[in-house]
Amino acid sequence: MGRFKSLVDSKEGIENFMVQYRIPPGVGIKYCKERQWHENKQKGEVVIPMITFIEGGMRIPKVTVTRDYLRAYRLAPTQCALNMFRILGFLDTLNEKMGLGLTHYDVNWVYNLLHLKGQGYYLKSWYPEIRLIQCFPDSYKGLNKDFLIVLEEWHGGLPCSTREG
């Protein structure tokens, strides 16, 4: 059992989770453990690690920078490390609150997309002195064991990758 299962183990828990992380009412979610989502996911549904909502600022429907970055690199959320969602979510929040108009191209100017075998894709700064976000925790070990299968109108009408590869 994952660390975050207690947040969504009841109908009331799911409702509270949806309110707290601003998931619209037309979107459904269901919990699954690591390695279990391959059997439970239906066509058109997307699997998103719970930690990306809790620590990474993931929002449904995906906001512009996050959605465009994942589409440009043809990545599904299960292929991405948490730091990617933190950076992309941070840019989406800056755009929303300050109207900066940042895009996924701005991410490419500062970060390089790398793949760590067994861990997924992550963003690494081209230059250590220049970053969009500081103060990442040293490790998220053990926090990526819980997943949500997001169904119904999670994509806001735009095509998004739902499978790896």
Where do the language-model regions lie?
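Residue-register detector that marks a fixed positional context within folded domains
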Residues: 1-165
